[in-house]
Swiss-Prot record:
Entry protein name: Cryptide Pep-1
Keyword terms of this UniProt record: Cytolysis, Secreted
One Gene Ontology term, aspect cellular component: extracellular region
Main location: secreted
Location within or outside the cell: Secreted
Nucleotidyltransferase in keyword set: no
Domain of life according to the entry: Eukaryota
The keyword Nucleotide-binding is annotated on this UniProt entry: no
Note: The primary structure of this cryptide Pep-1 is identical to that of cryptide TyPep-1 from Tityus serrulatus (AC P84189).
GO terms of biological process kind: killing of cells of another organism
């Protein structure tokens, strides 16, 4: 997914 700190990307959250 595209990295958007404005709403926090779900893909990044799942990786964490």
């Amino acid at each position: 997914a595209e990295i958007d700190f404005s709403g926090i990307p779900e893909d990044i959250i799942k990786q964490i």
